Amino acid sequence: RYRNKAQYPVGSDGKFATIGFYASMTHRIIDCADCLLQPKEFAKITDIFRDWIRMKKISVYNESDGSGIIRHIYIRKAVVTGQIMVCIVANSDSVPHTEALIEQLEEIDGMTSIILNINREKTNVVLGKECKTLWGSNYITDELCGLKFNLSPLSFYQVNHDGAEILYNKAKE
């Protein structure tokens, strides 16, 4: 479980919301309950999203016609501080029923930041340029090689914290 970031596409199998990963060489989303490369909290977060989308009847993005609201769920966890950021990537500048979602997400240990990212472009680029903080901080903080980094959804940061630290320390030698 070495990855500190995940970007899950959100779609529909025709009946239910699917949150997971693209099937090889396609844009068909395979629902994934857990990924052993990512922190355990990520599975709990995606479960909360699945239930929220179903219960509140939130529309999911349809790539072919550009309709629907929820496009991706983007999650980061700072390895050293344990802080977690959840970013809802939406095809709209507002999402209905976020209060119910936030109420559940804020109960997760380490939850620090819940952000809405707006991406109305008909593109396969995950994040749009605009972010709105829905709850908590607009960034999480992590440490790498003794330095502190404030990470927003738009920040670049190595997904393998420990591997990056080894490489950077080797480069310093």
Predicted segments, located by residue:
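Accessory RNA-recognition modules of RNA-modification enzymes
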Residues: 1-173
